[in-house]
């Protein structure tokens, strides 16, 4: 395919146009008075959202050069979401400001490499400063973080705080849609496994890049599965039940994996596979833990069970299973508390008998996974558009809360960034001249999120920024009330991890844009209009597709 090549100032300006197109649509959602964005869907009703990452993912520009710039911003938002779980809109506003100021200086003849070096050195120093001023989160502050991230929804904030209290800060909390109109919290048996899907072709939710299975069966084995023939008896039994299947094995490869992927794609089977956690003897023990938790059996030849003779009762059950590229969360389908307590007792006995610190740590981890359970927040609302938006808000709040617990907190509402801007001058004192300009670019960009929060609230951003600069560390602008007050006392808090990730990712992408000298993109092909063919005759020629019946072509049924 032919390529479009763009050089120098032209290439950078095209990137900037793409950056601005996406950032302008995202930044209006920032803050407690952020505006909504209506997203048209190819199928179904339009979606009304107030969530930066959701808006960013939906945008694709017609011009391929500009679209490259938009995709860079999507990368910033996505990376921040992956690392911190929140702060995507803040990261977008920061990177737009960095690129805007940076390109002005590049156009004026400043060396872009020196600018990038100044931006990188300043960012590195500011990250250390964030760690110094952050305070540990505890007690009511957990609910405050969740409330702010959920759009000042106190009910959600309290629910997330209760979930953290019930399963501990290291526990697993999931969010799912409820069939009722109310949002409620439930703690159930379940487990978090640090293994993701073997193949991305198992994905069922393309937007989230996850596998989501409901009312599923689980095949747990310590075997490595290479041939599909080993799985045929089990697959037949599960297919008759019409339930999804998760395979947990040492590995699934060769024609076994290929056949599963093909039949999942054809809709013949709803199936996914993950590798078993752990190694050696510890792996078998972990698999046995999962089997007990999910009311099934470990299929192992060591105990006289094989795949071809396994009954449907040997398969485990799960209410829901969620798998991403790195982790799997299983919510158990039935209550097996006596068996779980018995298993925990066995592990505690091993814990008492071992002298190895490593073994003690791993045994304690197993007890925590079995005893901790999973907190499930069931989101209810009508209509469907409100349900989706509410679920997004709760997921954002949950992610922000986890980030706050992990790396402490600081004042929110853009105040921490304003404080960091005041630290730039002493940081740049030993920089070279053009590097100092890079530091100044960071300093100005750090004001952009607060300015945008104020603009979205209908205030003059520059006036608000000026007043906040002259305030004490904890004092800032509460856009929800229009007051200047102690933000931490008011519950307006930013997790340090969110601020750090937003700044680091924004600086990284901005540096790439400033040092870009050429862009190579594919030239869009003009598709010729296809005239209607009067001889199509009702598409009768499709009758030959009748041979796709089930898995017959693969020898499975």
UniProtKB/Swiss-Prot annotation:
Its main location: cytoplasm. Pfam families: Cpn60_TCP1. Gene3D superfamilies: GroEL (3.50.7.10), GroEL-like equatorial domain (1.10.560.10), TCP-1-like chaperonin intermediate domain (3.30.260.10). It is an enzyme of class 5 (isomerase). GO terms for molecular function: ATP binding; ATP-dependent protein folding chaperone; isomerase activity; unfolded protein binding. Belongs to the chaperonin (HSP60) family. This is Chaperonin GroEL 2. It comes from Anabaena sp. (strain L31). The gene is groEL2.
């Amino acid at each position: 395919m032919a390529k479009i090549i763009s050089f120098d100032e032209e290439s950078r300006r095209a990137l900037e146009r793409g950056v601005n197109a996406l950032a302008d649509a995202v930044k209006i959602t920032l803050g407690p008075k952020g505006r909504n964005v209506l997203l048209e869907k190819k199928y179904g009703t339009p979606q009304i959202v107030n969530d930066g990452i959701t808006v960013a993912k939906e945008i694709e520009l017609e011009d391929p050069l500009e679209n490259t710039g938009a995709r860079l911003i999507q990368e910033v938002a996505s990376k921040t979401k992956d690392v911190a779980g929140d702060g995507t809109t803040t990261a977008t506003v920061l990177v737009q400001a960095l690129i805007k100021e940076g390109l002005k200086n590049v156009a004026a003849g400043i060396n872009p490499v020196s600018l990038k070096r100044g931006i990188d050195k300043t960012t590195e120093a500011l990250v250390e400063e964030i760690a110094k001023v952050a305070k540990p989160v505890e007690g009511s502050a957990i609910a405050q973080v969740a409330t702010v991230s959920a759009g000042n929804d106190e009910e959600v904030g309290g629910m997330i705080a209760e979930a953290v209290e019930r399963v501990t800060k290291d526990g697993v909390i999931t969010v799912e849609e409820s069939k009722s109109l109310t949002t409620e919290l439930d703690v159930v048996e379940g487990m978090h496994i640090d293994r993701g899907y073997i193949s991305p072709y198992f994905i069922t939710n393309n937007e989230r890049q996850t596998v989501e299975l409901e009312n599923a069966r689980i095949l747990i084995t310590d075997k490595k599965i290479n041939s599909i023939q080993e799985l045929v008896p089990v697959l037949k039994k599960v297919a008759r039940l019409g339930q999804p299947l998760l395979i947990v094995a040492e590995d699934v490869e060769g024609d076994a994996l290929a056949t599963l992927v093909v039949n999942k794609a054809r809709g013949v089977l709803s199936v996914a596979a993950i590798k078993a956690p752990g190694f050696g003897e510890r792996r078998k023990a972990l698999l046995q833990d999962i089997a007990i938790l999910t009311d099934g059996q470990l299929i192992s030849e060591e105990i006289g069970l094989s795949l071809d003779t396994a009954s449907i009762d040997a398969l485990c059950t799960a209410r829901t299973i969620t798998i991403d590229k790195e982790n799997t969360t299983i919510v158990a389908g039935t209550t097996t508390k006596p068996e779980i307590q018995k298993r925990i007792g066995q592990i505690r006995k091993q814990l008492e008998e071992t002298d190895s610190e490593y073994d003690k740590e791993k045994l304690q981890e197993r007890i925590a996974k079995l005893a901790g359970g999973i907190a499930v927040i069931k989101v209810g609302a009508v209509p469907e558009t409100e349900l989706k938006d509410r679920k997004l808000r709760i997921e954002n709040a949950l992610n922000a809360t986890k980030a706050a617990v992990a790396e402490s907190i600081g004042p929110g509402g853009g105040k921490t960034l304003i404080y960091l801007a005041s630290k730039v001058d002493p940081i740049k004192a030993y920089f070279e001249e053009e590097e100092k300009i890079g530091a100044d670019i960071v300093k100005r960009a750090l004001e952009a999120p607060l300015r945008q929060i104020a603009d979205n609230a209908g205030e003059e951003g520059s006036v608000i920024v000026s007043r906040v600069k002259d305030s004490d560390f904890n004092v800032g602008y509460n856009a929800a009330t229009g007051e200047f007050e102690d933000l931490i006392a008011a519950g307006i808090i930013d997790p340090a991890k969110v601020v750090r990730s937003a700044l680091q990712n924004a600086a990284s992408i901005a540096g790439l844009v400033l040092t870009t000298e050429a862009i190579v993109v594919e030239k869009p092909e003009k598709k010729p209009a296809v005239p209607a063919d009067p001889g199509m005759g009702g598409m009768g020629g499709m009758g030959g597709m009748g041979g796709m019946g089930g898995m017959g072509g693969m020898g499975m049924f």
